[in-house]
């Protein structure tokens, strides 16, 4: 399947269209799948289940969500300074996160300045996903925070952060290629409690 952006097919596309989504090209996203971004069922479910029926998540005309997910391509603004990288957390003794890195990207204050787009004003764009995707970007928390916020207005109404309560990787990321941490041993392992 194709997954330029995480969670679109898993969380927003209806079950009846999931296979179709995997078989089509991003050039067809606006025609076939934009409706799922403009009227995200997950926003409705968050309002009903998490907030008891009176939640803050806008459920209609989500042009902000469509702007992130349609078309399903990773969008990267190359006019900015280099991205900040995740390490082993801000207090890691030998491999801390770069100064200014936030797993919550723009919602955690991790922003860059673009010279080619207005972004959220004065060229401010996310320091991570959905402006590219770095190891350490907590895409679930960023996406859920975006769903319950309203990024269509100026200034944006930010609610959260919200998400899955997983706030770090169990092993530090590398700051040199290949950046990913060493994989867990599949045969001899223990579970963290």
Annotate each PLM feature.
Residues 1-193:
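Surface-exposed extracytoplasmic segments
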């Amino acid at each position: 399947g194709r997954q330029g952006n995480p969670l679109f097919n898993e969380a927003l596309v209806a079950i009846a269209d999931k296979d179709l989504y995997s078989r089509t090209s991003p050039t067809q996203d606006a025609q076939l799948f934009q409706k799922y971004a403009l009227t995200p069922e997950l926003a409705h479910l968050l309002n009903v289940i998490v907030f008891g029926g009176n939640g803050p998540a806008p459920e209609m005309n989500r042009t902000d969500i469509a702007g992130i997910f349609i078309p399903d391509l990773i969008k990267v603004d190359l006019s900015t300074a280099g991205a900040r990288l995740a390490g082993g957390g801000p207090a890691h003794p030998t491999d801390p996160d770069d100064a200014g890195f936030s797993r919550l990207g723009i919602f955690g204050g991790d922003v860059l300045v673009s010279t080619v787009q207005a972004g959220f004003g004065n060229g401010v764009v996310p320091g991570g996903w959905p402006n590219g995707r770095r190891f350490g970007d907590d895409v679930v928390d960023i996406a859920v925070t975006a769903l319950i916020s309203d990024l269509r207005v100026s200034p944006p109404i930010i609610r959260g952060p919200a998400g899955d309560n997983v706030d770090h990787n169990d092993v530090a990321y590398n700051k040199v290629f290949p950046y990913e941490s060493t994989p867990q041993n599949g045969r001899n392992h223990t579970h963290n409690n």
